[in-house]
């Protein structure tokens, strides 16, 4: 249906950041390009805003002289305080788009919820993007998952107010799997998100994770078994209302099923690698490249003929808890242009 990829519309890998994330964006959201144009544009807009923030923040990590995220955040806080965009501020055009979407007398309850979640997401980015980040406890870790992944999912379009809390827990689950997928990538930039109390419980050090020697510590495997067999079960349980919901918007049903399939793949490959996060990336991304064309073909076939919320493009067993149950890229000055110059911002329909 579409030769244009989602990564090409949300600024993937177009400026200095930590990783080439075009494949991550395809793994997360390639299905968006198969939606009806009017629905697709809503998703691309929100994902574009979120990816912009991710990449501005990551640019500050790789370039100590950069302040692009802080410029955007200042402009946002002005908008939040005064209800209007500060003239001449950085990223004025994007902030104006956000203001038009969520502010004003005609704003709906969903708009106000989205605004609240967007503010929560920006606060989380400001809090958790740093070289010296240390998460002390498992409870603090779950708060981080909800502040980042939960708020992210709540900003996405076509989410009903009654599904807001469920989306937060599903987003937290998503963030957990993104963190699992990116352990090596984070270690390479000196970051370990595993809470200190969990590391201490199993005799693993933060330095071992960052130096990529943790797999040599017998306690590391036990720690990962705890996180995947015990803690993950709790996250799944909290996300279960959305996983089993039968009244989601059709696009959300696809997001949910696509994501669950992705979580299954991440966990399976991680276990096949015996929790070795240094071996995981090569095997995982190779599987993603093989898997994506098949998944897209399935979306095209099933979504093209059945667009009701109760349809599923990936078969799931809803009679029990599923057994198994994250970007970021290159050139800050191009990011805003990428988001603003895409077809939906110029009044054209993408193909």
Please state what every model-predicted region is.
Residues 1-105, 111-174, 180, 185-351:
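Catalytic cores of Mg2+-dependent Asp-rich isoprenoid enzymes
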């Amino acid at each position: 249906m579409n030769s244009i990829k989602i990564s090409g519309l949300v600024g993937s890998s177009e400026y200095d950041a930590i990783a080439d994330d075009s494949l991550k964006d395809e793994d997360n959201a390639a299905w968006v390009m198969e939606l009806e144009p009017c629905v697709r544009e809503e998703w691309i807009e929100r994902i574009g805003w979120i990816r912009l923030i991710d990449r501005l923040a990551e640019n500050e990590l790789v370039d100590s002289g950069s302040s692009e995220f802080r410029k955007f955040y200042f402009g946002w806080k002005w908008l939040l305080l005064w209800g209007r965009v500060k003239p001449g501020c950085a990223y004025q055009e994007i902030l104006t788009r956000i203001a038009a979407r969520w502010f004003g007398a005609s704003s709906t309850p969903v708009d106000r919820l989205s605004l609240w979640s967007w503010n929560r997401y920006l606060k989380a980015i400001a809090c958790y993007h740093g070289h010296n980040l240390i998460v002390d406890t498992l409870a603090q870790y779950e708060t981080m998952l909800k502040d980042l992944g939960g708020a992210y999912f709540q900003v996405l379009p076509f989410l009903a107010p009654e599904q807001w809390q469920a989306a937060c827990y599903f987003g937290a689950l998503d963030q957990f799997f993104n963190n699992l997928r990116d352990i090596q990538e984070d270690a390479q930039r000196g970051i370990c998100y595993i809470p200190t109390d969990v590391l201490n419980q199993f005799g693993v050090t933060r330095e071992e994770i960052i130096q990529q020697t943790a797999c040599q510590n017998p306690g590391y495997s036990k720690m990962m078994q705890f996180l995947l067999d015990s803690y993950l079960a709790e996250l799944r349980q909290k996300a279960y209302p959305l996983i089993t919901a039968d009244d989601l918007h059709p696009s959300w049903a696809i997001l949910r099923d696509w994501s669950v399939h992705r979580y299954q793949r991440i966990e399976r490959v991680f276990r096949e690698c015996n929790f070795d996060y240094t071996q995981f990336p090569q095997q995982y991304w190779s599987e993603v490249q093989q898997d994506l064309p098949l998944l897209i073909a399935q979306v095209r076939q099933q979504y093209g003929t059945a667009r009701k919320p109760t349809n599923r493009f990936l078969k799931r067993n809803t009679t029990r808890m599923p057994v198994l149950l994250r970007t970021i890229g290159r050139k800050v000055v191009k990011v805003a242009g990428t988001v603003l110059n895409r077809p939906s911002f110029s009044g054209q329909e993408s193909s």
